[in-house]
Amino acid sequence: MKVRASVKKRTPECKIVRRKGRLYVINKKNPKYKQRQG
């Protein structure tokens, strides 16, 4: 999980999800793209 100031979709499979007021990027196919907005 990378913590970034700005999260972007790196691939078309990435999904942007809002949990507890934070933005997350999740990718089932390739989990190395997991990000959270700091």
Swiss-Prot record:
GO (cellular component) term, any one: ribosome
GO biological process: translation
SUPFAM superfamilies: Ribosomal protein L36
Single annotated GO MF: structural constituent of ribosome
Database matches in InterPro entries: Ribosomal_bL36, Ribosomal_bL36_sp, Ribosomal_L36_bact
Xref: Pfam families: Ribosomal_L36
Keywords linked to the UniProt accession: Ribonucleoprotein, Ribosomal protein
HAMAP family, A to Z: Ribosomal_bL36 (MF_00251)
Database matches in NCBIfam families: PRK00831.1, rpmJ_bact
Family, similarity comment: Belongs to the bacterial ribosomal protein bL36 family.
PANTHER family named among the record's database cross-references: 50S RIBOSOMAL PROTEIN L36 2 (PTHR47781), LARGE RIBOSOMAL SUBUNIT PROTEIN BL36B (PTHR47781:SF1)
Name of the protein described by the UniProt record: Large ribosomal subunit protein bL36
Native source species: Porphyromonas gingivalis (strain ATCC BAA-308 / W83)
